[in-house]
Amino acid sequence: DKNLSKKAIKYGYNDTMKAFNKLEGNRYTFKKGQIEKNNNMYQQTYEHIMSKVLRFKNATKDFYKQLKITSDIPTKLEDKLLLRVMELVAKDFNLDDTKIYTYRSFNRAIRKELKKRIKELDTTETRKTKKTEVELYLEMEKGNYKDLRTLGLLNPIELLKAVYLYTICED
């Protein structure tokens, strides 16, 4: 298949450039320095929102225990965690993983897809426990932090993704 071949060539190019430190990212590919720029732009807001949602020391400890990491994580690990969250959101939103992104083009694509998914969301079917990052994002917009805390402990990865969505949509 012609499209499959094109995709394979793009993957090969991206991976080679990553190996030579010309591009960065794991599953998704970013121009050099873009992940750091994204972190500089959003890390503080991201952490602020996380602390607002978790609010209590025990909730924070329980949350990070769910993720199997300590709450006093060093910056390098935090950077990797934020990249992991970004890429999980992108995967859920079916972003093109052959494209080379800047942090702006990446976040723009995510915001565009988020708007589409909010429109598609069937509000009559509200689940009590397993909520998607889009549903958690909407709860965050309403300021339902108590519910978010509970749901976040049940689905820590979904909460991290929702906080990322909220962070990039607030600027």
Residue ranges: model-predicted function:
Residues D1-D171:
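Patatin-like phospholipase
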